């Protein structure tokens, strides 16, 4: 049963400065996410925006379900592309524990078109 949904849309050009500033990348993205971006070649900005949007969409989806304050950073929410092209969340630290304790399933889709990236998350039990 669907417990919650989250959606986030973001302007792709917001991430131009991330390519010139490694500290910004390191603040929001895991090393694995950054390495995967570097292998991408074309479409790096769209991918960055999509991953960031997915992290924000998950937080929005979880917010109404969480009764206690948890400590997390956006790096605790990792976006992984599987060999067939679909994407999943790889969670770390307190947010991972919370999802496991609540026995929730997460579904994610990301799309981008020129100026914008959007992510949509469904949380089910």
UniProtKB/Swiss-Prot annotation:
Its EC number is 2.7.8.7. Mg(2+) binds at residues 8, 56. Gene3D superfamilies: 4'-phosphopantetheinyl transferase domain. The keyword Magnesium applies. Coiled coil: none annotated. It is found in: Cytoplasm. One of its GO terms (biological process) is fatty acid biosynthetic process. GO terms for cellular component: cytoplasm. It catalyses: apo-[ACP] + CoA = holo-[ACP] + adenosine 3',5'-bisphosphate + H(+). It is an enzyme of class 2 (transferase). It comes from the Bacteria. Keywords: Cytoplasm, Fatty acid biosynthesis, Fatty acid metabolism, Lipid biosynthesis, Lipid metabolism, Magnesium, Metal-binding, Transferase. GO terms for molecular function: holo-[acyl-carrier-protein] synthase activity; magnesium ion binding. InterPro entries: 4-PPantetheinyl_Trfase_dom, 4-PPantetheinyl_Trfase_dom_sf, ACPS, Ppantetheine-prot_Trfase_dom. Its cofactor is Mg(2+). The keyword Cytoplasm applies. Transfers the 4'-phosphopantetheine moiety from coenzyme A to a Ser of acyl-carrier-protein. Belongs to the P-Pant transferase superfamily. AcpS family. HAMAP family: AcpS (MF_00101). This is Holo-[acyl-carrier-protein] synthase. It comes from Borrelia hermsii (strain HS1 / DAH).
